[in-house]
Amino acid sequence: MRIGHHQLTNCLIAAPMAGITDRPFRTLCHAMGAGMAVSEMLSSNPEVWRTDKSRLRMVHSDEPGIRSVQIAGCDPDDMAAAARINVASGAQLIDINMGCPAKKVNRKLAGSALLQYPDLVKRILHAVVDAVDVPVTLKIRTGWAPEHRNCVEIAQLAEDCGIQALTIHGRTRACLFNGDAEYDSIRAVKQSVSIPIIANGDITDPHKARAVLDYTGADALMIGRAAQGRPWIFREIQHYLDTGELLPPLPLGEVKRLLIGHIRELHGFYGQGKGFRIARKHVSWYLQEHAPNDQFRRTFNAIEDASEQLEALEAYFENLSVKKELTELCSNNE
């Protein structure tokens, strides 16, 4: 799929997720087969640009793949300024957030709350597109409530404003992440515009990915929560799309390598004083399958030192490997 002059290596995109899709996670998703990874949301409010959190989020240079940066806000001038400063910092695509359903974002009339105001949407899109010389994309939901699905109207407006690709999450703002995503609206949007359409929502495995592409006619898929603790999902899906065959489960040793490598990158990126806190949620996601009783995760979350985290993970996987060998030995002797 092409967005402006950028050719993606495949049709799988890692979704922007606040507090998750930082540089270490984006780099890992890219290595695991994502055709593009979009940055976590950056506020257009200039008052927060100088904070440590924003400073780290605005590091875009020397990153693998196409550097797509998402911005959020409701003031057209602020959004234009945010787009310019991120392009100056290395962004190659600007993505506009009109899909976030979080209350703290919607209270500021940002995210999916904007879908109620098409005129303001139009002003924001024009301002950002005119402000930068890189492609601008848009992420939305199907509407702000089940009885107010206006994604086709917004999609047509976006195309008229110069938006070069549109991502649609298959729920309304009111739905949050409850219930199942629906794809009829995404299919209707695909049939109503000529710009690339990216389907998002509940794409959790290779079979679902194939089904959503076939049903909606979308040009690409955006995967978010399903990649938490499982960044290799991009490789799994791409292999299935290419061959019709499923990859075998990732070996435990490879899970260990990826997890510990990810945690080391988090420690390095945020500093050991903060990195160990960021690492906790990622470890919890990685180990959902291997530590279902939560005992190790509770123990891990009490650790307040980066090096101790790595030691605990090494010991955990060593113990898990021994248990697996004993189980296999007992099975062979039966």
Swiss-Prot record:
Keywords: Flavoprotein, FMN, NADP, Oxidoreductase, RNA-binding, tRNA processing, tRNA-binding
Keyword check for Flavoprotein: yes
Active-site residues, record numbering mapped to chain: 100
Binding-site positions, FMN: 16-18, 70, 139, 200-202, 224-225
Annotated catalysed reactions: a 5,6-dihydrouridine in tRNA + NAD(+) = a uridine in tRNA + NADH + H(+); a 5,6-dihydrouridine in tRNA + NADP(+) = a uridine in tRNA + NADPH + H(+)
Record keyword Transport present: no
Top-level taxon in the UniProt lineage: Bacteria
Cited Pfam families: Dus
Cofactor entry: FMN
Top EC class for this record: oxidoreductase
GO molecular function, one term: tRNA dihydrouridine synthase activity
EC code(s) of this entry: 1.3.1.-
Family the UniProt entry places it in: Belongs to the Dus family. DusB subfamily.
NCBIfam families reported for this sequence: nifR3_yhdG (TIGR00737)
Role: Catalyzes the synthesis of 5,6-dihydrouridine (D), a modified base found in the D-loop of most tRNAs, via the reduction of the C5-C6 double bond in target uridines.
Protein name (Swiss-Prot/TrEMBL): tRNA-dihydrouridine synthase B
Naturally occurring in which organism (per UniProt): Serratia marcescens
